[in-house]
Swiss-Prot record:
Fe cation binds at residues 210, 291. It is an enzyme of class 4 (lyase). PANTHER family: FERROCHELATASE, FERROCHELATASE, MITOCHONDRIAL. Signal peptide: none annotated. It comes from Idiomarina loihiensis (strain ATCC BAA-735 / DSM 15497 / L2-TR). GO terms for cellular component: cytoplasm. Catalyzes the ferrous insertion into protoporphyrin IX. This is Ferrochelatase. One of its GO terms (biological process) is heme biosynthetic process.
């Protein structure tokens, strides 16, 4: 096997610290053609769908990829903007803002970039770009506040797979979760309070998280517990009583039982229980995306209003708001402790260039 080297490296050059923020991914366009390879990559991940591989291969390629790309493309069209996919540009904005924040302390010694677990920008390509810039210490932050094997661990799998192809590996640190990180809770609470200041409160506040199969919880995945802890900490910070908020789970897929209560079923039931107004916030989504803008902002609105509800409001994700960037930057700084880089003088760089030149074979 031929391992990938670092041809741009020169002895004595400045080592840099890299911060790689990642998210799930997005198709290249809201079209059936673009959705098929994206969904195939996503749904082929054994961390996402824990089903015997041969059986799932037949289901995925024989059924799902024949019909789902068209339906998904129609949904993506409703959230697509001039800048493209919301998840893509929000993550890009977050990375840019984090970089600006960190450079106040680290200057040019730090490199910040972003990648997607599925689709583009591909994780392996971004890691290579960062290595070529001199990154020798790499901190990875998957933007999933609550850990799950289907998201956070999958990101680590992809990173580890990339490392198997490299000759020179960077020092690595990997943030697995931040569901109870106080600055994150504060940023989320302030986002909700900002909405309340503009629109007032509803009868009920729902914290809706992406669901996972119940089987994953029973097999030891801590995601369910971390979601409930985030909800509890937010409720305490906001001064909410137990009857003023709910934790629900959305986006279930297939016939298997997932974490409950389901967001959509809750929306259909609440008006019959006397709840006429609701506000929904999604603490597990660092950026607005299809699941928040379309599924929560539109689809679940219809369920609630058609069931007798009178007022429904989606509270947007934290995206690149300053409080969120401050929280993520502090989280990163906490995890960079103990790492340092050495500034390279002009004289040292000239010496390094000379050494590199002497080490290269002579031209004929």
């Amino acid at each position: 096997m031929k391992y990938q080297g670092s041809p741009g490296f020169s002895h004595g050059q400045a080592d840099k610290i890299g911060v790689l923020v990642t998210n799930l991914g997005t198709p290249e366009a809201p079209t059936k053609k673009a959705l098929k390879p994206y969904l195939k990559e996503f749904l082929s991940d054994p961390r996402v769908v824990e089903v015997p591989r041969l059986l799932w291969f037949l289901i995925l390629n024989g059924v799902i990829l024949r019909f789902r790309p068209k339906r998904s493309a129609e949904a993506y069209k409703t959230v697509w903007t001039d800048r493209g996919s919301p998840l893509l540009f929000h993550t890009q904005d977050q990375a840019s803002a984090i970089e600006a924040k960190l450079k106040q302390t680290w200057g040019d010694n730090i490199v910040v970039d972003f990648a997607m677990r599925y689709g583009n920008p591909a994780l392996s390509e971004v890691v290579e770009k960062m290595m070529q810039k001199g990154v020798r210490k790499l901190l990875v932050l998957p933007l999933y506040p609550q850990y799950s094997a289907s998201t956070t661990a999958s990101t680590f799998d992809a990173l580890a797979k990339d490392f198997t192809k490299r000759r020179w590996l960077p020092e690595l640190r990997f943030i697995t979760h931040y569901h109870d990180f106080s600055p994150f809770i504060e940023a989320a609470a302030q986002r909700i309070e900002k909405h309340w200041d503009a629109h007032g409160r509803a009868d009920k506040l729902l914290f809706s998280y992406h669901g996972i199969p119940l089987r994953y919880l029973k097999n030891g995945d801590p995601y369910h517990c971390e979601c409930y802890k985030t909800s509890r900490l937010l409720a305490e910070r906001l001064g909410l009583g137990k009857d003023e908020y709910l934790t629900t789970f959305q986006s279930r897929f297939g016939r298997e039982e997932w974490l409950q209560p389901y967001t959509d079923m809750t929306m259909k039931a609440l008006p019959g229980k006397g709840v006429k107004s609701v506000q929904v916030f999604c603490p597990g989504f660092s950026s607005d995306c299809l699941e928040t803008v379309e599924e929560i902002g539109e689809e679940n609105r219809e369920y609630f209003m058609e069931s007798g509800g009178e007022r429904y409001e989606y509270i947007s994700a934290l995206n690149a708001e300053s409080g969120h960037i401050d929280a993520l930057s502090q989280l990163i700084e906490n995890n960079l402790q103990g790492w340092s880089v050495e500034d390279v003088t002009e004289q040292r760089q000239q010496r390094a260039d000379q050494v590199k030149k002497q080490s290269l074979p002579y031209d004929d």
